[in-house]
Amino acid sequence: RNNYEVWMIDYPGFGKSTGKRTEPIMYDDAATLYKMARAKFSKDSIIIYGKSIGTGVAAQLASISDCKRVMLETPYYSIDALMKHYAFMYPVSWLAKYHFPTYSYFKKIDAPITLFHGTNDEVIPFKQARKLAGENPGVELVTIEKGKHNNLNESPVFHQHLDALLQLP
């Protein structure tokens, strides 16, 4: 679709991948995939796309790698902020296995950033994306009314914006 090759990672513990899953390993896996892509494509041809847990990884990669654009679907501000939403009375940042401070990477991203998020996301509250959008002045937040965590691809608004972005020079 739109003449793009799509390269994806199965993080350890997801899909058919095995092995230990840690935040640094996930960052390293993304960097390795980026290096492989750069061997074949120019930086101006690479779009870094992350979904859900992968949005923090994608943001970190985009903060240290040149690319054409960054697209994040159902992003979170940070895992700590997300955990505080669910367990607001506990010191969750001390207990968290991952932190993925997505917001901290946004200030270092030079490429255009587009966020896709549904207003009825039952996993990552929409307010996380809205807060994240404020971390970089050029962020475009595409709001999918009544969209949930795993159904944004069913929305015509999602496809219209995605297709328009993929056709940009």
Task: Give the residues covered by each predicted segment.
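Catalytic histidine-centered segment of alpha/beta-hydrolase-like enzymes
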Residues: 147-159
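Short beta-strand/loop motif that positions the catalytic acidic residue
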Residues: 108-110, 115-121
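Hydrolase active-site cap/lid region
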Residues: 55-105, 111, 156
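Acidic catalytic loop of the alpha/beta-hydrolase fold
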Residues: 119-124, 149-150
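Alpha/beta-hydrolase active-site loop signature
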Residues: 11-15, 77, 148
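Membrane-embedded segments
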Residues: 1-40, 53-56, 62
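Conserved alpha/beta-hydrolase "nucleophile elbow" surrounding the catalytic nucleophile
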Residues: 46-55, 118
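Short alpha-helix in the alpha/beta-hydrolase fold that links the catalytic acid
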Residues: 102, 111, 125-134
